[in-house]
Amino acid sequence: MRHRAPHLLPVLLCLLISSAGCAFPRIVVLRDPLTSEEHLNLGVTYEKQGEYENALKEYKRAAKDLPVAYLYMGNVHFQRGKLDEAEKLYKRSIEKDRANADAYNNLAWLYYVKGENLDEAEAFALRAIELNPSKNHIYQDTLEKIREKK
């Protein structure tokens, strides 16, 4: 019996080590299965349901490829009364996409609501009208309200 034990121990050790890897399977996600557009749409759904933190997480994921996601994040912060954060995000949206008329309009509206930077707000509203004349009625409303407040 004593002579068999030294030979049996290495065999048992090999079996134990090789079976340990099989006993605990690991799931490794190499990349995000959702596209940026899907993250944006999921964020919109969360936002509509009032789940703002989840919406922000999804917009943040979408922002890697879609600059418009910064606009959406700004809108969430605006709705929650976090105007300084909304302002930063609207500016970031404009920085990333200078042709985003909605970002200019929303920043103009934010300044209107805060009652500050009204000259700049007017310029932003005019820029929105220039960039997207098809939404002139929306942007014109912003512009008129700003001019009334000045």
Which role fits each region the language model picked out?
Residues 40, 47, 78, 112-113:
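Position-specific recognition of the canonical hydrophobic site in helix A of tetratricopeptide repeat
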Residues 36, 67-71, 101-102, 136-137:
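Helix-start (N-cap) detector for alpha-helical repeat units in TPR-like alpha-solenoids
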Residues 49, 80, 114-115, 150:
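Structural motif corresponding to the intra-repeat A-B loop/turn of tetratricopeptide repeats
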Residues 41, 72, 106, 141-142:
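Canonical tetratricopeptide repeat
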Residues 31, 62-65, 96, 130-131:
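Structural marker of alpha-solenoid helical repeat scaffolds
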Residues 44, 75, 109-110, 145:
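Residue-level recognition of tetratricopeptide repeat
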